């Protein structure tokens, strides 16, 4: 109450509104490198501390959450508001205040958390999730049941980033600030976090935390070099890399077939 009475609530509310309108972002690519905007992430985290809990009653249930976020991004919108925003939003898609959705995006029944940035022409498919502060580029397809993880804390940590023209297969998860490079195709049922080994099948090189642009990635296993009888461990395998022209002309299924 003290913070709200001193006007800090209005400051944070403006920050959330700027996130909502795409004027600011939790992370951004600068000179070819992704950086986290710590002050934006801190504003989100502090807003949870200064706003009280509130109740919202509906026709079949009630909800209890922070007052400034209890109602979603599009609460009270008219048809004209939706037309101006320019994205399609299917019923039963919780999209939180403080998330940005670009024009011509399609939100099937999905979940979009605070701070998420979804660029133009991207589809978040049925029961897929866009976590807090994640950045999803233009013309991506986040397939049914898949998730793009959120990262709020620590403030300096990069959120999970999906660059332009990426296909993320059904029931997959990319989390913990992993970066998926532009034009990549990730097959169904792949899971990638910061500790996941990413193996280039052609070179044998192992890396972590980043999928290079225009990679085609499938789940795989990696044997223990020192013990042939030990259980193999999960990894993500880059089976090929293609150029932009090939990616644009080749179907996802053809790219994944070897």
Sequence positions of predicted segments:
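C-terminal functional extensions of proteins
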Residues: 215-258
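Generic structural "secondary-structure junction" signal
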Residues: 4, 26, 42, 46, ...
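Extended, small-residue-rich solenoid/repeat segments and analogous flexible loops
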Residues: 24-111
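Exposed loop/turn and edge beta-strand positions of beta-sandwich/beta-sheet ligand-binding modules
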Residues: 2, 156, 232
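Single conserved hydrophobic/aromatic residue that forms the stacking wall/gate
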Residues: 1-8, 12
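Structural signal for interior beta-strand "rungs" in well-ordered beta-sheet cores
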Residues: 83, 87-225, 238
């Amino acid at each position: 109450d003290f913070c709200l009475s001193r006007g800090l609530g209005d400051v944070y509310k403006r920050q959330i509104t700027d996130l909502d309108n795409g004027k600011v972002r939790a992370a951004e690519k600068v000179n070819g490198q992704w950086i986290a905007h710590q002050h934006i992430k801190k504003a989100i985290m502090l807003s949870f501390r200064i706003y009280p809990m509130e109740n919202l009653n509906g026709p079949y249930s009630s909800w209890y959450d922070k007052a400034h976020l209890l109602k979603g991004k599009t609460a009270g919108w008219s048809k004209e508001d939706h037309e101006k925003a320019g994205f399609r939003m299917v019923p039963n898609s919780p999209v939180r205040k403080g998330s940005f959705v670009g024009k011509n995006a399609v939100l099937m029944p999905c979940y979009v958390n605070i701070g998420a940035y979804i660029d133009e022409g991207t589809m978040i498919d049925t029961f897929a999730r866009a976590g807090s502060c994640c950045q999803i580029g233009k013309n991506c397809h986040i397939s049914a049941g898949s998730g793009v993880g959120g990262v709020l804390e620590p403030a300096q940590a990069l959120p999970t980033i999906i660059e332009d023209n990426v296909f993320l297969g059904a029931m997959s998860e990319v989390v913990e600030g992993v970066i998926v490079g532009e034009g990549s195709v990730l097959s169904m049922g792949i899971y990638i976090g910061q500790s996941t080994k990413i193996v280039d099948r052609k070179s044998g090189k192992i890396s972590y935390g980043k999928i290079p642009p225009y990679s085609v990635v499938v789940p795989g296993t990696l044997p223990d070099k020192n013990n042939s009888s030990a259980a193999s461990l999960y990894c993500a395998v880059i089976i090929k890399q293609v150029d932009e022209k090939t990616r644009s002309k080749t179907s996802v299924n053809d790219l994944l077939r070897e």
